[in-house]
Design a protein with these regions (language model features):
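A hydrophobic/aromatic-rich effector-binding and dimerization subdomain
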Residues: 2-14, 74-132
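Generic protein-terminus/edge-of-domain signal
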Residues: 1-67, 73-74
Length: 132
């Protein structure tokens, strides 16, 4: 697909000694190119109705609230598309794929989290708190 062929390889600011990074932004547009990186990325978007989410081969218009977990090296990005809002709130958390080691994830109580990480290889759209 053309999206994958034109994806930008992002070099994140996440250093080996960091556990995670958090970016909290108010924006009027999405100007970062479609990209991929080896880290996990959890994205929360508020006031984004009409924004188009690109994850892998999937293109979807989002609602006012968006929470998605993107797995390592999965092509992703957001485009303004039909969104008219100029006050979009975006919180991004990037973390290494070894932050939660196999021993921890193999514990029974972590099975739902391990399953969520496995599904994130395709982009895991998470329910947003009952749509607040």
């Amino acid at each position: 697909m053309a999206i994958t062929n034109n994806a930008h390889r992002e070099i994140t600011q996440l250093a080996p000694e960091d556990s995670f990074l958090v970016f909290d932004r108010i924006k009027s547009e999405f100007d970062f190119p479609i990209h991929f990186h080896p880290e996990y990325e959890l994205n929360f978007i508020h006031n984004g109705k009409g924004v188009r989410r690109v994850v892998g081969d999937s293109l979807q218009e989002i609602d006012d609230l968006e929470l998605v977990l993107v797995g390592p090296n999965l092509v992703h990005g957001w485009e303004l598309h039909q969104c008219k809002n100029t006050n979009i709130h975006e919180i991004t958390i990037q973390f290494h794929n070894d932050l939660f080691d196999d021993k921890l994830l193999s514990r029974r109580i972590f099975k739902p989290i391990k399953d969520m990480f496995n599904r994130s290889n395709h982009g895991e759209d998470l329910p947003v708190f009952g749509q607040l």
